[in-house]
């Protein structure tokens, strides 16, 4: 597994999350990591072959775990990071340092986030949606007391550029994306972070978290 004390720092510093089926991760993920992915959300679609899926995850942890956070969508596979999609109620964590993320559907989940979750995924489209505005206003991305959140959707470099111009600093590519797309998106967000007035103070805070 990843180093326990670094999990919170790593989610605070993450810019690009990619979502893809766990079964495809062995082939696709190495390239996406090179492209700049910081988090991989590995989905099972509710059909878990625990022995097979655990082996895939452990192999990924062994080869890529120091370069990105590996998240799963089910409590049936023990992982340092898990995402609760709508309808999932099990908030169990395998250890006290494990991270839980929530895919939000309501404004209240952003304005008054549940303390059980260490990060959120907010629908990133359409641009200027009520949920996106609520996240930008109530959880400014590089404010130290904000819950880190990702604007999620089938995003490309153009839409990420538009999001970054509104203040978004993290994105979650629900369709995974190509290596080239991830490279472009990572560059857009790297520049946006560097130009953000809050960046220097936030960086120091996040590294020490």
Task: Name these PLM-found stretches.
Residues 42-44, 85-92, 119-130, 164-193:
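Glycine-rich phosphate-binding active-site loops on the catalytic face of alpha/beta enzymes
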Residues 12-20, 40-42, 68-72, 82-84, ...:
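Hydrophobic faces of well-ordered beta-strands that scaffold small-molecule active sites
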Residues 2, 17, 144-209:
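C-terminal alpha-helical cap/extension of soluble enzyme domains
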């Amino acid at each position: 597994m990843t180093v326990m004390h670094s999990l919170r720092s790593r989610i605070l510093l993450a810019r690009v999350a990619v979502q893809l089926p766990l079964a495809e991760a062995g082939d696709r993920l190495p390239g996406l990591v090179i492209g700049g992915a910081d988090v991989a959300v590995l989905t099972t679609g509710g059909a878990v072959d625990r022995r097979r899926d655990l082996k895939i995850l452990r192999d990924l942890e062994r080869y890529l775990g120091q370069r990105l956070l590996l998240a799963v969508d089910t409590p049936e596979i023990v992982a340092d990071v898990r995402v609760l999609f709508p309808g999932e109620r099990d908030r169990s964590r395998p250890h006290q340092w494990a991270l839980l993320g929530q895919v939000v559907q309501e404004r209240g989940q952003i304005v008054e986030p549940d303390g059980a979750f260490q990060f959120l995924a907010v629908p990133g489209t359409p641009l200027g949606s009520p949920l996106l505005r609520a996240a930008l206003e109530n959880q400014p991305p590089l404010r130290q007391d904000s819950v880190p959140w990702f604007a999620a959707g089938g995003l490309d470099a153009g839409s990420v550029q538009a999001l970054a111009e509104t203040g978004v600093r993290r994105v979650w590519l629900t369709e995974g994306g190509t290596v080239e797309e991830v490279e472009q998106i990572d560059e857009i967000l790297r520049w946006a972070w560097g130009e953000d007035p809050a960046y220097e103070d936030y960086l120091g805070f996040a590294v020490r978290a």
